[in-house]
Every structure is written in structure tokens, then in C-alpha cells.
Amino acid sequence: MWGARRSSVSSSWNAASLLQLLLAALLAAGARASGEYCHGWLDAQGVWRIGFQCPERFDGGDATICCGSCALRYCCSSAEARLDQGGCDNDRQQGAGEPGRADKDGPDGSAVPIYVPFLIVGSVFVAFIILGSLVAACCCRCLRPKQDPQQSRAPGGNRLMETIPMIPSASTSRGSSSRQSSTAASSSSSANSGARAPPTRSQTNCCLPEGTMNNVYVNMPTNFSVLNCQQATQIVPHQGQYLHPPYVGYTVQHDSVPMTAVPPFMDGLQPGYRQIQSPFPHTNSEQKMYPAVTV
């Protein structure tokens, strides 16, 4: 990346130096061709003298002014000796006009102003500068590393997901619902002995469906205060998702296992629950009781 940028910068500098050399050559050529033009004239002997561009071949570079008189014209650098060619009447050839040059009295015979060559050279210089600036800007913009669009995203969209607890998948809920029957005996004994009053929750925190707070299998998460009623209703976990860890290892017996008589303390169980024998033999005659699951 940096090597490409350095190469682009060096190429831009080379292009700038080449433009400077070209402009210097143009300025030199323009300075040489920026002198006045001395029109042809008839000398004292009646011989026609062809006009020339100042400076001439043997003149200095600063001899850009047409000086002298109407009968003798030459190039010089003094503005005081400048010849007013408009006041001369011997600079028009009789018959045909000057070859390669328009007649002075014609529509195209006026002398070219001095500032025109400088104006042309300056315009070319400014055009080259503008073109070089545009090329450099385009190169820098193309070689600039692109920003990752994911970095510009605000991290505030994940705050809500951080507050929501992890909800097990459907397979976990199915497996846990099959293990609910193993805890029916212990939970029903605690429910019949004395049911505790469900904790009161303010209606401003969360709106739950009726009967949810009276269910002893639900452990309500503590992060529902940031959600509205509709979201809280959708995220209420299944009854079998929060079970006591000691009951995870028990399995469900098949229908082929002989059923035993229902003890008296299981008369108040909910419909659909039945007692399941534990696959592990008890060392004592007394039935091992587990603590009840509370909210």
C-alpha cells in the first residue's frame, strides 16, 4: 500500500518537472517570437525591403522593438527609439502585397499586440497547472485505503441483545419437559405443605400473563425491566427450562415398566403426572427427598 503511494507520488513529481521543462521551452520560444514585426518598406533608392520579425537572427534576445525610421528599420530594445509604423507611407508595395504577409492597409494588416504571445503562454501554463492538480487529486483518491463499513456502525445496536438472557433451543426444552415427571413427587410435597405467596412485581417493569407467577418451575430473569410487555411475553421461558441440577441425570422409563401404587401424598398432583421409579436402587428403605424448587 505504502509502496504504491510512494510510486504515485514520485510519478506525480516527475510529471510536474516535465511540465516545468516544457513551459520553460514554451516561454523561451514565446519570448523569442514576442517581438514586433517591422513591415516591409521602400528605401531611398526605391528598392523594396522585406519585413522581418524582431529580434532578428543576429540581434540580442531583448531586441524586440522595431526602431529606426520609415526608410531604415531595425530591431532594438529601447522603447524611446520605437518607430511608429502607422505614420509611414512607404511600407506598401506597389501592385502585389508583400509575400507571406498581409498588406498593412488591409483588414489583416494591423500589427500583432505585444501582450498576445505572453497571454497565450500564460494561459497554457495555467492550464497545465490545473490539469496536474486534477491528476494528482485523482491518484491520491484512488490509492487511499478504503474504510471498513462495519467499523462505522454504532455499537449501540447490540446493547439490547446483551441484556436478554440466553434462551435454550427447542431441543433443550423438549428434553427438559420429558424430565419434569421425575421431580413431581418432591415438588408436590412442598406445594401441598404450604404454598408461598408469589413475589409481587410492579406492573411498570413487565406485564406477564396470568398464572405465570404462580408457577414454581419458572425462574424469572432479572433483565425484563428494559423490555416492554410484548417482548416479555415472547421471552417467557418454558416450565422445564429451569430445573434443579440434581435431576438432570434421571431418565424416563418406558411404558413396559410396571407401575406402582400412587402414594397418598400424590393425590393433589396436576393431571398428566405419574410416579416413575428411579433406575438407581436405594440403600435405605426411606425414600430420598430432594429440596423443592423455589422462585
From Swiss-Prot:
Q: Which GO terms describe its biological process?
A: negative regulation of fibroblast growth factor receptor signaling pathway; negative regulation of Wnt signaling pathway
Q: Which residues lie on this side of the membrane: Cytoplasmic?
A: 132-295
Q: Where is this region: Disordered?
A: 87-108, 168-205
Does the UniProt entry include the keyword Cell membrane?
A: no
Q: Where do transmembrane segments lie in this chain?
A: 111-131
Q: Which InterPro entries does this entry report, sorted A to Z?
A: Shisa, Shisa_N
Bilayer topology: Single-pass type I membrane protein
Span of the signal peptide: 1-33
Quote the subcellular location field of this record: Endoplasmic reticulum membrane
Any idea which UniProt keywords this protein has? Developmental protein, Endoplasmic reticulum, Membrane, Signal, Transmembrane, Transmembrane helix
Record topological domains on the Extracellular side: 34-110
Q: Which GO terms describe its cellular component?
A: endoplasmic reticulum; endoplasmic reticulum membrane
Compositionally skewed regions (Low complexity) per UniProt: 169-197
Q: PANTHER family under this entry? A: PROTEIN SHISA-2 HOMOLOG, SHISA
**Role according to the record:** Plays an essential role in the maturation of presomitic mesoderm cells by individual attenuation of both FGF and WNT signaling.
UniProt similarity note: Belongs to the shisa family.
Name of the featured protein: Protein shisa-2 homolog
